[in-house]
C-alpha cells in the first residue's frame, strides 16, 4: 500500500514546535543545540514514514496471532548529510531508519551575492530507483540545495527525492518545489537578508552545532 504523498509538509506537532523554540534561543550551547536538532530529525522521520509503502503482516505473539504492518520501502532509502551542519539532523533520521544507506556531500556557499556554491566532496551510493532524503537544517536562498541536486545527477535517478529542513524561506521553497521535490519543514519564513540568512531564522546551524571554525 502507498501512504499519502504531498509536495510541501509543514510539521506542526507541538513537541516539534517546542524543540524549535529551544534551538532558536540566543546563547544555546552546542550540545543542547545538537540534541534538539537530532530530536527534530527523528520526529520528522516519523512524519515522512507515513508516505512510504507498506504491507499487512501477521506475527506470532506469546498468546496468539496479531495483525501488523511492515514498511517495504526501508531498503530503498538513502540519507544524505551535508557537511557539517546537517550531521545531528541526519542522526535523528537514522534513529528511525537505521538500515538506510548514507551519503555525504561537502558544499560551501559564498557569503556574498550571488552566493555561488562549490561542491568539494561527494560520496554517495547509487541512487537509481532509491528514495533520497536530503537533510539540511536551513533552506535560505536555495542555492546550496540546487547545487547539491545538480551534483547528484551523475549518481543516478532517484524514484523520489525528499528534502528535510528545520526552517525554510519562501524563496528557497519556491525554487526547490519547482523541481518536483518533496519538502518537509518545521517553519516557513519570508525574509532572507543581504548575507543570505533567513530572518529571524536561527543563525548558522553549523557554527551553533560545532562551534565557529577558525578559517
Swiss-Prot record:
What enzyme category does the UniProt record give? transferase
CDD domains assigned to the protein according to its UniProt record, in alphabetical order? PRTases_typeI
List the molecular function annotations (GO) for this entry: GTP binding; magnesium ion binding; uracil phosphoribosyltransferase activity
Q: Supply the Gene3D superfamilies for this chain.
A: 3.40.50.2020
- Gene Ontology biological-process entries: UMP salvage; uracil salvage
Q: Write down how the cofactor binds this protein.
A: Binds 1 Mg(2+) ion per subunit. The magnesium is bound as Mg-PRPP.
Q: What is its EC number?
A: 2.4.2.9
Keywords associated with the record: Allosteric enzyme, Glycosyltransferase, GTP-binding, Magnesium, Nucleotide-binding, Transferase
Which of this chain's residues are annotated to bind uracil? 198, 203-205
Protein activity control: Allosterically activated by GTP.
Short name of one Pfam family for this protein? Answer: UPRTase
- The residues listed in the UniProt record as binding 5-phospho-alpha-D-ribose 1-diphosphate, with positions renumbered to this chain, are 84, 109, 136-144, 204
The record, for InterPro entries, names: PRibTrfase_dom (IPR000836), PRTase-like (IPR029057), Upp_A (IPR034331), Ura_phspho_trans (IPR005765)
**What cofactors does the UniProt entry give for this protein?**
Mg(2+)
SUPFAM superfamilies listed in its UniProt record: PRTase-like
Q: Which reaction does it catalyse?
A: UMP + diphosphate = 5-phospho-alpha-D-ribose 1-diphosphate + uracil
Q: Which pathway is it part of?
A: Pyrimidine metabolism; UMP biosynthesis via salvage pathway; UMP from uracil: step 1/1
User: What NCBIfam families does this protein's entry cite?
Assistant: PRK00129.1, upp
Protein function: Catalyzes the conversion of uracil and 5-phospho-alpha-D-ribose 1-diphosphate (PRPP) to UMP and diphosphate.
UniProt similarity note:
Belongs to the UPRTase family.
HAMAP family hit by this protein = Upp_A
| Name under which the protein is recorded | Uracil phosphoribosyltransferase
Please report the organism this UniProt entry assigns to the protein: Methanothermobacter thermautotrophicus (strain ATCC 29096 / DSM 1053 / JCM 10044 / NBRC 100330 / Delta H) (Methanobacterium thermoautotrophicum)
Gene assigned in the entry: upp
Amino acid at each position: 500500500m502507498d501512504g499519502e504523498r504531498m509536495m510541501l509538509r509543514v510539521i506542526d506537532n507541538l513537541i516539534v514546535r517546542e524543540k524549535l523554540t529551544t534551538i532558536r534561543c540566543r546563547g544555546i550551547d552546542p550540545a543542547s543545540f545538537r540534541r534538539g536538532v537530532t530530536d527534530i530529525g527523528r520526529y520528522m522521520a516519523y512524519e515522512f514514514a507515513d508516505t512510504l509503502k507498506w504491507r499487512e503482516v501477521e506475527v506470532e505473539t506469546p498468546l496468539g496471532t496479531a495483525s501488523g504492518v511492515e514498511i517495504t520501502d526501508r531498503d530503498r532509502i538513502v540519507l544524505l548529510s551535508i557537511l557539517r551542519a546537517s550531521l545531528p539532523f541526519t542522526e535523528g533520521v537514522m534513529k528511525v531508519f537505521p538500515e538506510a544507506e548514507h551519503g555525504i556531500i561537502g558544499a560551501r556557499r559564498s557569503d556574498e551575492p550571488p552566493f555561488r556554491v562549490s561542491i568539494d566532496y561527494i560520496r554517495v551510493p547509487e541512487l537509481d530507483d532509491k528514495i533520497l532524503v536530503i537533510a539540511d537544517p536551513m533552506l535560505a536562498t536555495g542555492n546550496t540545495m540546487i547545487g547539491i541536486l545538480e551534483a547528484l545527477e551523475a549518481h543516478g535517478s532517484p524514484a523520489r527525492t525528499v528534502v528535510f529542513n528545520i526552517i525554510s524561506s519562501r524563496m528557497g521553497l519556491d525554487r526547490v518545489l519547482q523541481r518536483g521535490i518533496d519538502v518537509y519543514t518545521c517553519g516557513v519564513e519570508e525574509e532572507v537578508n543581504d548575507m543570505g540568512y533567513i530572518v529571524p531564522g536561527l543563525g548558522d546551524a553549523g557554527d551553533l552545532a560545532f562551534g565557529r571554525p577558525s578559517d
